[in-house]
Amino acid sequence: MGLPSIETVECDILVIGGGMSGCGAAFESKFWGEDLNVVIVDKAVIERSGATGEGLSAINCYMGQRYGWNTPEDFVHYVVNDMMGLAREDLVYDVGRHVDSSVHLLEEWGLPIWKKDNGEYERIGRWQIPIHGESLKPVTAEPARKAVGKENIYERVSITHLLTDANDPNRIAGAIGFGVRENKIWVFKAQAVIMTSGGASNVFRPRSVNEGIGRTWYSVFATGSAYGLMIPIGTEMTQMEHRFVPTRFKDGYGPVGMWFQYFHAHVENALGEDYTVTRDDELKKYEPYGSAIPTPTPLRNHQMFLDIKEGKGPMYMRTDLAMQELAGGDPAKMDKVREEAWEDFLDMTIAQAMTWASQNIAPEETPSEVVLAEPYIMGSHSGEAGAWVSGPEDLAPPEYYWGYNKMTTIRGLFAAGDGVGAAPHKFSSGSFTEGRLAAKSAVRFVKENSTSVQLNASQVNTLAESIWAPMETFDKYKGVSTAPEINPHYITPKQALVRLQKIMDEYAGGTSALYTTNGPTLELSLIHI
């Protein structure tokens, strides 16, 4: 077949990924580096790219300092407790002290935030404010698009590898990828790169299979590229063994946060028991975190897991009791509560609203099943996998700081969002904030390091050939069998995915293994892989 055409783009700063952190990075890069050429590349379209592409019903990271709600110190205390001690206090504080200004910026750009009659933000939890958030991502993307200019946005381009300097393997030099809708390989040469691509869904076999395939809680398009790009060039990572297992509504994967915090619902097992009450003594095994308020997410999930393991399921979110109590017998209030219940999912998890509708569930009358989902790997939600990055100069201890905030151990490579490890609970607003912080550092790095990077032509050609190799293999052997998915010379991407999921599910602590694993089991999984 021969290689497709190769096109090279040169820039000062390359932003990889157009999610919340990517849009924040692109916008902020042009604010501080007005004279710099900033390029953003995304495998989709930035208006709907990233984990929030479908929308959100709440901002889950907001201090509320203007109202005296919380301080960054409060946030650090909460995050460290929720992660049972495993978190970088400097990185968490850095997000906490800046995130409010990011939320106010999003509101200025047009994000509708729920407000009280006096103009104060509504509040549904200590750190959460409700929004009409179906449009969150387009609202965030528009300023980024305008800031860098349409000529500097490369969409439908999938980045496959990072490139290092020809004379220094510890210096970033750009990236290479391919057009997903055109016959072209793209090479980006950059003085600095900001890694803002996604965490990893679909590594473990989802609970939704066969007819439900493609339905996951975290974005189905989060393929772990933040990690798959940084690790091969030697970037130091942290907390990569951390798996986040969320409690979610069954089958539709609807989040439970709004139901716990705004509707004040609770979960019961089939016997009508509340596991947070009946298993309170279990928490004492995990002090000092067992007595932390609120109870850390891993421990709450562990309490539910024990109920399920002992055969006390199904587990039900008592939406009916919560909605009836909020309405207080007033039909008009019930109409409002019902509207808010459905909007919660229509704003961000339409599949859950469809699940209710298809099963004739009226949440004010019928409780809904909840389950522990399959594990996910990410750095922006309640997971903390990602790169080991330099902290802020005024907060980080000497061993955590090497010149530029959010820079990885590869010079010139910065990270934000899912790409940063040991800094969880950022969610959408915090990821956007972290992208902005990384961009500010990247601009300073470019201005202070003027020596131009050099691409290794041999490296580029080798990677271009490896990118194109699957197409060559398919074209060469497609005639060997009459069914393209059954062939002795290759496997399809879908076949590779389901085989990986089977191995991870059964050997690496997935749902079928009750989230358990051990050394010999993991070693066996490597043999199978």
Regions found by a protein language model. Give the residues of each.
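Core beta-strand elements of the Rossmann-like FAD/NAD(P) dinucleotide-binding domain
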Residues: 9-11, 183-192
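N-terminal Rossmann-like FAD-binding beta1-loop-alpha1 element of flavoenzymes
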Residues: 13-39
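Mobile, glycine/GP-rich and aromatic-enriched active-site lid/loop segments adjacent to catalytic centers
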Residues: 100, 107-173, 241-427, 506-526
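Glycine-rich loop(s) and the adjacent beta-strand/alpha-helix scaffold that form part
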Residues: 195-254, 428-441
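Long, amphipathic alpha-helical stalk/connector segments used for oligomerization, subunit docking
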Residues: 448-526
